[in-house]
Amino acid sequence: LEKFNSFKNSISDTKIKFKKIDNLVDKLWLKKPKQNNSLIYKHNKKFTGLSHKEKKELIIKEIIKNNCDSLFISEPENTCWFLNIRGNDLDFTPLVRCYSLIERNGEIYIFSNHKISSNIKKYFQLNNITHLPIGKIEDFFKNKNFKRTIFDFKTTPYGLADVIFKYSTDYRNIQNPCSLFKACKNSTEIKGAINAHVRDGVALTKFLFWLDNKSEKDELNEIDIEKKLLRLREKEENFISPSFSTIAGTGSNGAIVHYKADKNNCKKLKAGDLLLVDSGGQYLDGTTDVTRTIALFPNEKKVNQEKKDRFTRVLKGHIAIACSTFKKGTIGKDLDPLARKFLIEEGLNYNHGTGHGVGSFLGVHEGPQSISPLGIQEIKKGMIISNEPGYYKENEYGIRIENLIVAQEMDKNDNHLCFKTLTLAPIDKNLICINMLNKEEITWVNSYHEKVFETLSKFMRDKELIWLKESCKSILQ
């Protein structure tokens, strides 16, 4: 709705008028595949930390504070968080396609076209949740005649907003309170994220060891990389699926930020090239997202100095975010320049945000928090965010270093926050220009690798352990 209103206002001085019509794409798309309405299942409190009833109390307080009688939730991930449910409607995000509404008296309605299992039916009945088909939303609002409904213009489709306007006496346009509650992870969710990142780190480290023992003669390609990573993650406890389609781009493909290899466009790995691997996993206790840039087969051919320089500048920016401390109230765009500084010094930059929010067994991209030039959300305690500066030279190579971080209070100063790094996997030392790092940056690299080794070594065997020890060996200036 917000985008529609913005567009409408931009042409207000013209004679253009708007008319509602049926979606033309739906009329033309004759062989449209059926939506995957998977079974809804309950997400256990041992992973969520808060029961549905506890979350309901938080939301009702917000409804009362805003002097409203209901809250309409248009984002499926907010409904899934609020009701502690998940589904498999999408390939990489455990979502249920749905809308929901909660009244200040505690009545809850979920609108979806899913068949409900007996277990979920019982769960809904016990928690005063009524399930209705999406097609009944207009009739529902017509019969209810709410006096004042909260809904978020940024996330509510125009058609649904029109129904609310038509049948509610009044409304309030505010950010959905679920979004911020969901973004600020509780202690159980943070503990789950830490544990999930250990297992994910085991899979990724075993992958890096495997790759380091290959050569150009093995004729590996980008799809081989995707398949190997998936096989290793599938062995880990609580793994459900990748958290997004793996990006494995070598050479010029690495410069395509959201590259996807397929059988018609799939490069072989060559010595001296860089391989950018951006991947992640959905685990019952957390969601991961990690990028490593790897110098391919360095024993056969060294990477050139330009690539090492660019990698080191990206690393310096990554470290700057990881080590930042900031006052409560700081917003994402205030932190973003820290990551770009060392590239900008050379007239370079990257055309994406430095960090996005990440869910807890939900979306790998989650708002409202971000570290970017557009990031206006205050960074709050418990928010999990990616730290992923990069550099991309078109038609040649791409570099990105990504760890997930969680905002936490500083031990000695409750008025300031800092970040704790969650991701555990070696950073390729073959690409670091050590003489470009200052003492504090070297200390960070060594401390990070020390933590990686201490945490993951117990899961490595024989040659894997020897390789990990060497990969995490301290660098000296």
Residue positions per predicted region:
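Active-site neighborhoods and metal-handling regions in enzymes and metal-associated proteins
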Residues: 1-477
